[in-house]
């Protein structure tokens, strides 16, 4: 079978996503990533340059996937929250990467893909507010943050509290959507 450099790069990226989501940047090991990808450790440096650059590529890959698969609707932020909840349920590694990014890269340079996406969403919410379709009780950026935080509420609690949460996914999703609706229509 001929060597496929794009396939190797993709395998490394997928292995990195799982490794970084499990261990964070500091705890991830390039030898485990290479082994999981069935690739040579040197391939990581050839394709990505460094472990930090590999994390950035893995994180950006998941963020782009998130943006492509979670439809944003400024007129229905509650359902947007529900779709975010669904994504975190279906791809928990995405949320874990976000959490590691917040912990280990809080002071790092901002990623353009996130800046651009946030700016677009805030702009669209502001327009919906001017149209009178979305509450002006909170600034647009706060509404976006509240929707995101509420969508993550079930996934970011300490185990002692999380163990008391409803186990039915539909119930948890419904709670997210209803809570965001109440924020939007107090």
PLM region spans:
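Helix-turn-helix
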Residues: 11, 15-53, 57
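Amphipathic alpha-helical interaction segments
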Residues: 11, 53, 79, 83, ...
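Amphipathic alpha-helical linker/stalk segments
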Residues: 22, 56-83, 118-121, 126
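Short coil/turn segments at alpha/beta junctions that flank glycine-rich nucleotide-binding fingerprints
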Residues: 22-26, 91, 131
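Helical hydrophobic small-molecule/effector-binding pocket
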Residues: 78-112, 151-159
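C-terminal peripheral helix-coil segments that are non-catalytic and often amphipathic
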Residues: 86-90, 119-131, 150-186
